[in-house]
Curated annotation (Swiss-Prot):
Signal sequence bounds: 1-23
Keyword Disulfide bond: yes
Family membership: Belongs to the DEFL family.
Keyword terms: Antimicrobial, Disulfide bond, Fungicide, Plant defense, Secreted, Signal
Species annotation: Arabidopsis thaliana (Mouse-ear cress)
Disulfide bonds: C31-C84, C41-C66, C49-C76, C64-C78
Highest taxon of source: Eukaryota
Subcellular location: Secreted
GO biological process, one term: signal transduction
InterPro entries per record: SCRL
Pfam families given in the database record: SCRL
Protein name per its UniProtKB record: Putative defensin-like protein 253
UniProt key word Nucleus: no
GO-annotated cellular components: extracellular region
Length: 101
């Protein structure tokens, strides 16, 4: 009986000790991506930007903000969760060419 009582007391203290431990959890950083496309935002600009990014197999599921440019095209400012991935080199070159000329 004595060992059973000690075991119950031990388990109770272990439960209290474990339940009061505070963990420091670091927030997962967002990755910011800004891309330009020669289309219109339309009724749902967020969906337009997400569709273009997924179509190019660049990012998994970004959250985007679509801004119409005064000249032509749209500017998609997107954020998605870790891990941050750079666009493929060919995509960056095509974006730069579109912006410059």
């Amino acid at each position: 009986m004595r060992f059973a009582s000690l075991f119950v007391v031990y388990c109770t203290f272990m439960f209290l000790d474990i339940s009061h431990v505070k963990c420091e959890v670091e927030p997962v950083p967002y990755c910011k991506v800004i891309t330009w496309y020669d289309v219109k935002c339309g009724a749902d600009g967020n969906k337009t930007c997400v569709d273009h990014l997924i179509k190019g197999h660049i990012y998994d599921v970004p959250v985007c903000d679509c801004s119409e440019l005064t000249t032509s095209g749209i500017l998609c400012t997107c954020q998605h969760r870790f891990p941050c991935k750079e666009p493929p080199p060919l995509h960056r070159i095509s974006i730069r060419k579109q912006i410059r000329g």
